[in-house]
Amino acid sequence: MAESHLQSSLITASQFFEIWLHFDADGSGYLEGKELQNLIQELQQARKKAGLELSPEMKTFVDQYGQRDDGKIGIVELAHVLPTEENFLLLFRCQQLKSCEEFMKTWRKYDTDHGGFIETEELKNFLKDLLEKANKTVDDTKLAEYTDLMLKLFDSNNDGKLELTEMARLLPVQENFLLKFQGIKMCGKEFNKAFELYDQDGNGYIDENELDALLKDLCEKNKQDLDINNITTYKKNIMALSDGGKLYRTDLALILCAGDN
Protein backbone atom coordinates (compact mmCIF):
# COMPACT_ATOMS: atom_id res chain seq x y z
CA MET A 1 0.00 0.00 0.00
CA ALA A 2 2.79 2.43 0.89
CA GLU A 3 4.50 1.68 -2.43
CA SER A 4 1.46 2.67 -4.50
CA HIS A 5 1.03 5.88 -2.49
CA LEU A 6 4.69 6.80 -2.99
CA GLN A 7 4.16 6.44 -6.74
CA SER A 8 1.31 8.96 -6.75
CA SER A 9 1.61 12.41 -8.29
CA LEU A 10 -0.68 13.74 -5.53
CA ILE A 11 -0.97 12.14 -2.10
CA THR A 12 -4.21 12.68 -0.19
CA ALA A 13 -4.31 13.40 3.53
CA SER A 14 -5.49 9.86 4.32
CA GLN A 15 -2.77 8.33 2.12
CA PHE A 16 -0.17 10.46 3.88
CA PHE A 17 -1.42 9.08 7.20
CA GLU A 18 -1.06 5.49 5.92
CA ILE A 19 2.49 6.19 4.69
CA TRP A 20 3.45 7.63 8.05
CA LEU A 21 2.07 4.64 9.97
CA HIS A 22 3.91 2.26 7.65
CA PHE A 23 7.32 3.75 8.36
CA ASP A 24 6.94 4.89 11.99
CA ALA A 25 7.26 1.30 13.15
CA ASP A 26 7.83 2.05 16.84
CA GLY A 27 5.12 4.72 17.01
CA SER A 28 7.54 7.31 18.40
CA GLY A 29 6.20 10.10 16.19
CA TYR A 30 9.53 10.46 14.40
CA LEU A 31 11.45 8.59 11.72
CA GLU A 32 15.07 7.87 12.54
CA GLY A 33 17.68 5.15 12.07
CA LYS A 34 16.38 2.14 10.17
CA GLU A 35 12.90 3.68 9.79
CA LEU A 36 14.31 6.66 7.94
CA GLN A 37 16.57 4.54 5.75
CA ASN A 38 13.62 2.26 4.90
CA LEU A 39 11.64 5.30 3.78
CA ILE A 40 14.46 6.54 1.55
CA GLN A 41 15.00 3.11 0.01
CA GLU A 42 11.30 2.43 -0.62
CA LEU A 43 10.73 5.94 -1.98
CA GLN A 44 13.52 5.54 -4.53
CA GLN A 45 12.35 2.05 -5.51
CA ALA A 46 8.69 3.08 -5.83
CA ARG A 47 9.44 6.08 -8.05
CA LYS A 48 11.82 4.04 -10.23
CA LYS A 49 9.30 1.22 -10.59
CA ALA A 50 6.66 3.71 -11.73
CA GLY A 51 9.09 5.32 -14.19
CA LEU A 52 9.05 8.59 -12.24
CA GLU A 53 11.93 10.90 -11.41
CA LEU A 54 12.46 12.06 -7.85
CA SER A 55 11.10 15.56 -7.38
CA PRO A 56 13.59 18.30 -6.37
CA GLU A 57 12.27 18.05 -2.79
CA MET A 58 12.81 14.29 -2.78
CA LYS A 59 16.34 14.61 -4.18
CA THR A 60 17.26 17.16 -1.51
CA PHE A 61 15.80 14.88 1.16
CA VAL A 62 17.71 11.81 -0.09
CA ASP A 63 20.96 13.79 -0.34
CA GLN A 64 20.53 15.15 3.18
CA TYR A 65 19.61 11.92 4.99
CA GLY A 66 20.64 9.03 2.72
CA GLN A 67 24.14 8.59 4.16
CA ARG A 68 23.45 9.64 7.75
CA ASP A 69 22.92 7.36 10.73
CA ASP A 70 21.84 10.21 13.01
CA GLY A 71 19.06 11.66 10.86
CA LYS A 72 15.65 12.34 12.38
CA ILE A 73 12.51 13.77 10.81
CA GLY A 74 8.98 14.43 11.95
CA ILE A 75 5.64 14.56 10.18
CA VAL A 76 6.27 18.16 9.10
CA GLU A 77 9.45 17.29 7.22
CA LEU A 78 7.79 14.34 5.45
CA ALA A 79 4.83 16.49 4.42
CA HIS A 80 7.25 18.83 2.64
CA VAL A 81 8.97 15.97 0.80
CA LEU A 82 5.93 14.14 -0.55
CA PRO A 83 3.47 15.65 -3.08
CA THR A 84 0.75 16.12 -0.46
CA GLU A 85 -2.62 17.75 -1.26
CA GLU A 86 -2.31 21.51 -0.96
CA ASN A 87 -4.74 22.37 1.83
CA PHE A 88 -3.46 19.60 4.10
CA LEU A 89 0.14 20.65 3.44
CA LEU A 90 -0.72 24.25 4.36
CA LEU A 91 -1.39 23.11 7.92
CA PHE A 92 2.34 22.43 8.23
CA ARG A 93 3.43 25.67 6.58
CA CYS A 94 1.52 28.30 8.53
CA GLN A 95 3.35 31.22 10.10
CA GLN A 96 2.17 30.30 13.60
CA LEU A 97 4.11 27.04 13.34
CA LYS A 98 7.42 28.37 12.08
CA SER A 99 8.79 29.14 15.53
CA CYS A 100 8.27 27.54 18.90
CA GLU A 101 7.36 30.88 20.49
CA GLU A 102 4.54 31.49 18.00
CA PHE A 103 3.35 27.93 18.46
CA MET A 104 3.19 28.40 22.23
CA LYS A 105 1.15 31.60 21.82
CA THR A 106 -1.25 29.78 19.50
CA TRP A 107 -1.53 26.93 22.00
CA ARG A 108 -2.42 29.37 24.77
CA LYS A 109 -5.20 30.83 22.61
CA TYR A 110 -6.93 27.46 22.33
CA ASP A 111 -6.10 25.92 25.70
CA THR A 112 -8.16 28.65 27.34
CA ASP A 113 -8.80 26.78 30.59
CA HIS A 114 -5.09 25.94 31.07
CA GLY A 115 -6.11 22.28 31.15
CA GLY A 116 -3.01 21.21 29.27
CA PHE A 117 -4.78 19.76 26.25
CA ILE A 118 -6.91 20.65 23.24
CA GLU A 119 -10.05 18.63 22.55
CA THR A 120 -11.56 17.72 19.18
CA GLU A 121 -13.71 20.83 18.70
CA GLU A 122 -10.87 23.14 19.74
CA LEU A 123 -8.54 21.32 17.36
CA LYS A 124 -11.04 21.75 14.53
CA ASN A 125 -11.20 25.51 15.17
CA PHE A 126 -7.42 25.64 15.38
CA LEU A 127 -7.04 23.99 11.96
CA LYS A 128 -9.78 26.16 10.47
CA ASP A 129 -7.99 29.30 11.68
CA LEU A 130 -4.68 28.12 10.22
CA LEU A 131 -6.27 27.60 6.81
CA GLU A 132 -8.13 30.92 6.91
CA LYS A 133 -4.87 32.73 7.69
CA ALA A 134 -3.48 31.13 4.52
CA ASN A 135 -6.58 32.40 2.64
CA LYS A 136 -7.93 28.88 2.19
CA THR A 137 -11.32 27.52 3.12
CA VAL A 138 -12.47 23.91 3.20
CA ASP A 139 -15.95 22.51 3.69
CA ASP A 140 -17.02 20.98 7.01
CA THR A 141 -16.56 17.43 5.74
CA LYS A 142 -12.95 18.03 4.72
CA LEU A 143 -12.25 19.94 7.94
CA ALA A 144 -13.61 17.02 9.96
CA GLU A 145 -11.37 14.66 7.95
CA TYR A 146 -8.29 16.80 8.66
CA THR A 147 -9.19 16.99 12.35
CA ASP A 148 -9.61 13.22 12.56
CA LEU A 149 -6.29 12.63 10.78
CA MET A 150 -4.46 15.08 13.03
CA LEU A 151 -5.75 13.22 16.06
CA LYS A 152 -4.64 9.91 14.56
CA LEU A 153 -1.22 11.33 13.71
CA PHE A 154 -0.50 13.11 16.98
CA ASP A 155 -2.66 11.56 19.73
CA SER A 156 -0.04 9.06 20.91
CA ASN A 157 -1.98 7.93 23.99
CA ASN A 158 -5.33 7.70 22.15
CA ASP A 159 -7.30 9.76 24.66
CA GLY A 160 -9.10 11.79 21.98
CA LYS A 161 -7.34 15.04 22.79
CA LEU A 162 -3.91 16.54 22.18
CA GLU A 163 -1.42 17.47 24.87
CA LEU A 164 1.17 20.18 24.27
CA THR A 165 3.99 17.73 23.52
CA GLU A 166 1.76 15.86 21.05
CA MET A 167 0.62 19.02 19.31
CA ALA A 168 4.21 20.27 19.12
CA ARG A 169 4.91 17.64 16.49
CA LEU A 170 3.39 20.16 14.08
CA LEU A 171 6.72 21.96 14.46
CA PRO A 172 9.81 21.07 12.43
CA VAL A 173 12.18 18.91 14.51
CA GLN A 174 14.82 21.65 14.74
CA GLU A 175 12.23 24.13 16.08
CA ASN A 176 10.70 21.78 18.63
CA PHE A 177 12.56 22.79 21.77
CA LEU A 178 10.22 20.60 23.84
CA LEU A 179 12.23 17.59 22.65
CA LYS A 180 15.13 18.93 24.71
CA PHE A 181 13.08 18.62 27.88
CA GLN A 182 11.72 15.12 27.24
CA GLY A 183 14.61 13.42 29.01
CA ILE A 184 14.62 15.63 32.10
CA LYS A 185 10.96 15.73 33.05
CA MET A 186 10.24 15.27 36.75
CA CYS A 187 7.59 13.24 38.51
CA GLY A 188 4.73 15.21 40.05
CA LYS A 189 6.24 15.26 43.53
CA GLU A 190 9.63 16.50 42.30
CA PHE A 191 8.03 19.11 40.07
CA ASN A 192 5.87 20.54 42.85
CA LYS A 193 8.91 20.75 45.12
CA ALA A 194 10.89 22.55 42.40
CA PHE A 195 8.04 24.95 41.65
CA GLU A 196 7.71 25.94 45.30
CA LEU A 197 11.49 26.37 45.58
CA TYR A 198 11.70 28.80 42.66
CA ASP A 199 8.42 30.59 43.40
CA GLN A 200 10.46 32.56 45.89
CA ASP A 201 7.78 35.04 46.91
CA GLY A 202 5.13 32.32 47.22
CA ASN A 203 2.58 34.12 45.04
CA GLY A 204 1.56 30.98 43.13
CA TYR A 205 3.33 31.71 39.87
CA ILE A 206 6.86 32.01 38.50
CA ASP A 207 7.96 35.22 36.84
CA GLU A 208 10.68 35.61 34.23
CA ASN A 209 13.50 36.10 36.74
CA GLU A 210 12.47 33.06 38.76
CA LEU A 211 12.23 30.99 35.57
CA ASP A 212 15.72 32.17 34.61
CA ALA A 213 17.11 30.82 37.90
CA LEU A 214 15.29 27.50 37.43
CA LEU A 215 16.55 27.06 33.87
CA LYS A 216 20.14 27.86 34.83
CA ASP A 217 20.05 25.14 37.48
CA LEU A 218 18.46 22.66 35.07
CA CYS A 219 21.14 23.38 32.47
CA GLU A 220 23.89 22.81 35.03
CA LYS A 221 22.40 19.47 36.08
CA ASN A 222 21.53 18.27 32.56
CA LYS A 223 24.39 19.41 30.35
CA GLN A 224 23.88 16.57 27.86
CA ASP A 225 20.28 17.61 27.18
CA LEU A 226 20.27 21.38 27.67
CA ASP A 227 22.69 24.06 26.49
CA ILE A 228 23.12 26.95 28.92
CA ASN A 229 23.83 29.21 25.93
CA ASN A 230 20.22 28.67 24.81
CA ILE A 231 18.61 29.81 28.07
CA THR A 232 17.26 32.99 26.46
CA THR A 233 15.48 30.91 23.80
CA TYR A 234 14.15 28.38 26.34
CA LYS A 235 12.87 31.21 28.53
CA LYS A 236 11.22 33.10 25.68
CA ASN A 237 9.42 29.97 24.46
CA ILE A 238 8.23 28.92 27.91
CA MET A 239 7.10 32.45 28.85
CA ALA A 240 4.89 32.43 25.74
CA LEU A 241 2.68 30.11 27.82
CA SER A 242 2.39 32.67 30.60
CA ASP A 243 -0.58 34.84 31.44
CA GLY A 244 0.69 38.42 31.39
CA GLY A 245 4.15 37.37 32.56
CA LYS A 246 2.77 34.99 35.19
CA LEU A 247 3.73 31.36 34.60
CA TYR A 248 1.39 29.24 36.68
CA ARG A 249 2.09 25.74 37.96
CA THR A 250 -0.13 24.03 35.36
CA ASP A 251 1.61 25.87 32.52
CA LEU A 252 5.15 25.02 33.60
CA ALA A 253 4.04 21.44 34.25
CA LEU A 254 3.40 21.06 30.51
CA ILE A 255 7.15 21.43 29.97
CA LEU A 256 8.72 19.88 33.06
CA CYS A 257 6.29 17.41 34.63
CA ALA A 258 6.08 13.81 33.42
CA GLY A 259 3.13 12.72 35.54
CA ASP A 260 1.51 12.53 38.94
CA ASN A 261 3.79 10.08 40.72
From Swiss-Prot:
Ca(2+) 3 binds at residues 155, 157, 159, 161, 166. One of its GO terms (cellular component) is terminal bouton. Residues 11-46, 53-88, 98-133, 142-177, 186-221 form the EF-hand domain. The keyword Protease does not apply. The keyword tRNA-binding does not apply. Coiled coil: none annotated. Pfam families: EF-hand_1 (PF00036), EF-hand_7 (PF13499). This protein has four functional calcium-binding sites; potential sites II and VI have lost affinity for calcium. Interacts with RANBP9. This is Calbindin. The gene is CALB1.
